[in-house]
């Protein structure tokens, strides 16, 4: 009898494991965040003049144009990390390695908590026009939005490493959510630039 109970318990273990697939709620959360951040990005840039695009509060701070350029560059890099994770073998320790990080990302990224130096490959050069930024942003979002709406990959069990120790291992889903939340973070930065004394009126 004891052996039978143990055997049955072992058989049930896989059924008790957390499902690595997205729940309908998680997929909807991602789609909603992408839609909101896309609308907000376009609205933030729509009426910006060339003078406003290039104006910098200080030599060290980014202009509206540089923030917008950084967002475009970062979205491409971040979706590349999603693809890197998806193309990697499933991580058997994904639950332990990624636990609590979606909540942490949602807390620190959109709210601009913590400061970090941007990687060189996504530092703005200051030579991207508003029209180019909007075009590249929209093009990138066609791909990223279609991905999350259609994918059946169990995104949570595929991981890729973040260069910042505070994040370390992130799942493909967490890397994906990084995209809209990072954009929201820098849209707040754009709002700060616009609210700075000396920002051109036109």
What residue spans do the PLM features occupy?
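Sec-dependent N-terminal signal peptides
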Residues: 4-13
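Short, helix-capping/interhelical loops that line the mouth of catalytic, cofactor-
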Residues: 16-29, 80-137, 161-167, 197-202
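Amphipathic, well-ordered alpha-helical segments in soluble domains
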Residues: 37-44, 74, 78, 115, ...
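N-terminal targeting signals for Sec/Tat export/insertion, comprising classic cleavable signal peptides
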Residues: 27-55
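Short, contiguous alpha-helical
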Residues: 55-104, 149-150, 154-202
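Hydrophobic packing residues in well-ordered alpha-helices of helical domains and bundles
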Residues: 34, 133-137, 176-179
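Amphipathic alpha-helical packing segments from all-alpha helical-bundle domains
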Residues: 139-150
């Amino acid at each position: 009898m004891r052996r039978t109970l143990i055997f049955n318990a072992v058989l049930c273990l896989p059924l008790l494991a957390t499902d690595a697939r997205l729940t309908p709620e998680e997929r909807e959360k991602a789609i909603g965040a992408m839609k909101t951040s896309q609308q907000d990005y376009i609205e933030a840039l729509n009426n910006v003049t060339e003078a406003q695009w290039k104006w910098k509060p200080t030599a060290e701070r980014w202009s509206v144009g540089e923030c917008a350029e950084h967002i475009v560059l970062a979205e491409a890099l971040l979706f590349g990390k999603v693809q890197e994770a998806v193309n990697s073998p499933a991580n058997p320790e994904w639950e332990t390695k990624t636990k609590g990080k979606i909540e942490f990302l949602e807390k620190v990224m959109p709210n601009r908590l913590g400061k970090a130096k941007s990687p060189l490959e996504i530092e703005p050069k200051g030579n991207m026009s508003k029209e180019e930024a909007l075009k590249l942003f929209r093009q990138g979002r066609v791909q990223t939005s279609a991905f999350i709406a259609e994918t059946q990959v169990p995104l949570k069990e595929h991981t890729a490493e973040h260069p910042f120790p505070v994040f370390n291992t992130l799942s493909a889903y967490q890397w994906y959510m990084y995209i809209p939340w990072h954009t929201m973070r820098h849209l707040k930065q754009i709002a700060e630039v616009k609210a700075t004394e000396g920002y051109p009126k036109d």
